[in-house]
């Protein structure tokens, strides 16, 4: 499960923490992972990840949100030991473009190296939208996305060859 916390203009309060605690206890009972995604919410993300140390609680890295909201903060280094999910997509730093990887300005070799060094063993998950790809058929878009995911996986594993 991936949860979006409030942005840092709306600092999470004790009631919010209590509600998350209830969700996390239920998730632990059912062995469900609860991850918190980086948005414009790094203070809230810090609070939640430092409050809940359960093995079922972790971090969902979103590459587009990283570039847009915290480009100077090494989020993978900071939370890599808690990394449980990836939302990978590209942009040029303007807004949440959700482009396919390698169509924007993200330095994918560096990102995937950091992910590899974090010890993350999960899937390489893309989160693109077809806004910039309306000229492609659905099948062409999916084929291209699959090729890009494979390329990211290659970058992730090249570190250990």
PLM regions with names:
Residues 1-58, 68:
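Active-site acidic/histidine proton-transfer and metal-coordination neighborhood
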Residues 42-161:
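Histidine-acidic metal/acid-base catalytic patches
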């Amino acid at each position: 499960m991936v949860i979006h916390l409030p942005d840092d203009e709306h600092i999470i309060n004790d009631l919010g923490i209590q509600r998350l605690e209830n969700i996390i206890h239920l998730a632990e009972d059912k062995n469900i992972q609860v991850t918190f995604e980086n948005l414009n919410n790094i203070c809230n993300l810090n609070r939640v990840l430092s409050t809940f140390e359960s093995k079922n609680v972790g971090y969902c890295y979103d590459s587009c949100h990283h570039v847009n909201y915290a480009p100077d903060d090494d989020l993978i280094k900071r939370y890599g030991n808690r990394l449980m999910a990836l939302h990978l997509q590209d942009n040029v730093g303007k807004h949440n473009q959700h482009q396919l990887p390698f169509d924007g300005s993200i330095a994918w070799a560096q990102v995937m190296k950091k992910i590899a060094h974090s010890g993350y063993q999960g899937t390489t998950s893309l989160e693109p939208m077809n806004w910039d790809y309306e000229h492609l058929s659905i099948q062409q878009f999916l084929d291209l996305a699959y090729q890009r995911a494979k390329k990211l996986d290659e970058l992730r594993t090249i570190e250990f060859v």
